[in-house]
């Protein structure tokens, strides 16, 4: 099937992307169309190959997608890019040995896409993680092209009320894969809790941008009560309930902080999809989300 994106449609169960040149051409075209970095798109494609293997594996009901890859799927690659895959595991241990066995099983799921996965390293996440977790580094090989992948896997996340079935639209194919994912309210609640509790020490500008873009595109679908409950559940899990009533003061402090303003300017310059967004516009979206959260108290 030639012409546009349908060129890559799975035909008779076999993948039509057979060579590195084909894949690079498709990535290059998508890069131009979406004004997105081709290297990042290549990583996204390989992360999709891993996601599809999850969806066909015995662990498909234990893996729950979250983080940047989920946000990018919700808003579009032209509005958010990501380099890594984040997931939480339920009903399974999260230690190095168990995750190594789990990953090894997933990457051997037979799919005729020509992609081979190699586990490079696996270790406990020691940085400022909200939940205990494991970091997996892999490389993928497709027709001689090697692409690095990083996957962060956590456990014990507070998902309110529960994970949802998500139809993940593939980047280069006219089809979707069904996976478990965070619901929108939990995605936003985690980011809001991080902004409130870390105040001006939160240098992750993507948290601020994600709230803005998700609120813009999906704000009308949010359930205030679920959002409120998700924020409380996240704060309880992270031991930060006492900070929630300081939210308004924190927003003022963050908005007026010169370092935060400079960090936002740097983020705007780095990512074209954020280039037109002023800092006060971002902070207004965060305040609106918190007001919606407070509405949920009385529901």
Language-model regions, residue ranges each:
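Structured mid-to-C-terminal alpha-helical surface segments
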Residues: 2-63, 72-81, 85-299
């Amino acid at each position: 099937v030639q012409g546009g994106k349908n060129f890559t449609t799975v035909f008779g169960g076999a993948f039509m992307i057979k060579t590195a040149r084909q894949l690079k051409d498709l990535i290059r075209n998508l890069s131009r169309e979406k004004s997105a970095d081709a290297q990042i798109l290549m990583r996204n494609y390989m992360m999709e190959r891993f996601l599809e293997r999850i969806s066909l594996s015995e662990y498909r009901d234990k893996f729950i997608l979250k983080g940047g890859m989920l946000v990018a799927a919700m808003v579009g690659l032209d509005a958010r890019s990501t380099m890594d895959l984040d997931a939480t595991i339920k009903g399974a241990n999260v230690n190095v040995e168990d995750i190594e066995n789990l990953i090894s099983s997933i990457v051997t799921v037979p799919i005729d896409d020509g992609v081979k996965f190699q586990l490079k390293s696996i270790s406990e996440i020691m940085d400022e993680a909200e939940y205990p977790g494991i970091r997996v580094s892999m490389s993928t090989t497709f027709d001689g092209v090697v692409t690095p992948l990083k996957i962060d896997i956590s456990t014990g996340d507070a998902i309110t009320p529960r994970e949802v079935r998500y139809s993940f639209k593939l980047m280069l194919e006219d089809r979707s894969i069904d996976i478990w994912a965070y619901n929108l309210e939990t995605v936003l609640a985690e980011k809001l809790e991080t902004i409130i509790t870390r105040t001006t020490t939160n240098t992750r500008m993507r948290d601020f941008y994600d709230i803005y873009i998700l609120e813009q595109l999906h704000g009308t679908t949010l359930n205030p009560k679920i959002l409120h409950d998700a924020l409380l559940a996240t704060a309880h899990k992270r031991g930060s309930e006492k900070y929630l009533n300081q939210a308004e003061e924190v927003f003022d402090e963050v908005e007026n902080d010169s370092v935060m303003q400079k960090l936002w300017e740097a983020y705007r310059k780095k990512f074209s999809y954020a280039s037109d967004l002023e800092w006060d516009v971002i902070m207004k979206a965060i305040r609106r989300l918190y007001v919606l959260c407070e509405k949920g108290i009385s529901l």
